[in-house]
């Protein structure tokens, strides 16, 4: 009887544990993993580059660069990428 109760408690714990510890970011991965083979292929094609900011996008934070034909212009409200 005691063994049965212990087994039931363990089974309940094991079924509830993943629900308690689960992260609520389901299907919201920001940077999906890229296989090494794909990464090498993109590097050879020159497509593995940092994203640049387009016209009228904010460029105030460090590390954010405007695309090659744009420049970051600071105004009273912040900074945006302009031609």
From Swiss-Prot:
Species: Conus miles (Soldier cone)
Protein name, entry field: Conotoxin MiEr92
InterPro entries linked: Conotoxin (IPR004214)
Propeptide: 23-49
UniProt note: domains: The presence of a 'disulfide through disulfide knot' structurally defines this protein as a knottin.
GO MF annotations, alphabetized: ion channel inhibitor activity; toxin activity
Listed transmembrane segments: none
GO cellular component, as recorded: extracellular region
Signal peptide interval: 1-22
Subcellular location: Secreted
Keywords tagged on the record: Disulfide bond, Knottin, Neurotoxin, Secreted, Signal, Toxin
Disulfide linkage: 52-67, 59-72, 66-81
Tissue: Expressed by the venom duct.
Pfam families listed in its UniProt record: Conotoxin (PF02950)
Family according to the record: Belongs to the conotoxin O1 superfamily.
Entry superkingdom: Eukaryota
């Amino acid at each position: 009887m005691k063994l049965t109760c212990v087994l039931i408690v363990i089974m309940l714990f094991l079924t509830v544990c993943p629900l308690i510890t689960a992260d609520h970011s389901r299907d919201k991965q920001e940077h999906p993993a890229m296989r090494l083979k794909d990464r090498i292929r993109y590097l050879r094609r020159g497509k593995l580059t940092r994203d640049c900011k387009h016209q009228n996008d904010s460029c105030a934070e460090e590390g954010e660069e405007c695309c090659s034909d744009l420049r970051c212009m600071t105004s009273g409200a912040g900074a945006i990428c302009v031609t």
